[in-house]
């Protein structure tokens, strides 16, 4: 039976078609599949922040101080995007655009840290080094690339490194961040529909600078309020403690570090509950993101791995809850167990993702509560103030 609004829908879609816009703009009702096409932040701990429900076609901001893991996190997202796209038929695969405004993206570190091959021939990276180009030109390049329908992920590194044409030739004293804010405001207003139509995700990496005016939060970011409000997801990264080969956290002065923890705060989300605010992932300097260790942390959170007696752990069957391992002495020895039983790890990993995606469990306790961590104190942020600024 035809909808009473069907005639109106066809008429409105025809008007857009006459303007050269392909595809239906108007629909009757909203498809339940609208947000089923999601992508990963690359770590079970980080995906848990968002209930593993990040939709494609949105604006994301990753902000943080120097060396806090912003670009490395973007590399990991790109790596997982490639894996997902390669599962599609060749004619449906989309590619990556990487805008290296800083000119510092290292393909070797991208591959070591995250598995992101910037020279992959199956899912290619359109790499732009716009050194000397104005912000207007760079953002126009991005929109032009997205309009082809061939780009599924844009990584922009970073917003703080671009300058509008108006101030590009000015002296350093005259440059300010206001021009970038106006440009980003125009960019998101004009192109939100474009990114949504082609399901292209835009990741804007942003640095922090400090205001000395004495009012409010001294931390400032480029892009302005409109950019913040256009973002459906905002993450703040922080370099956490180093750890040794046994996973023991170290002080900065301690020897024997093989990696460090990247701590991530969820500043804003538009698509899931905002009750999980802290994620922690392990970055091994020679092996990259340690997904095994992150799986252990989240599986412990969900009770799949249980501390049964004073530092002795057991791994339980993800479905039945029955023990499937002997007592393992020390949490550091769970990882070798998984390395020897990768089939068990994969079952635990899959179950972890199933459990983290449930949005209706009132008994869930966030990582920060379980670990007794004050996220506002750790990151120096005020979530109430962030909510007001994010819109």
Residue ranges and their predicted role:
Residues 2-123, 147:
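The Walker A/P-loop phosphate-binding site
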Residues 145, 177-302:
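Phosphate-binding/switch region of NTP-binding enzymes
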Residues 3, 7, 41, 57, ...:
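Charged, alpha-helix-enriched surfaces in structured cytosolic catalytic cores
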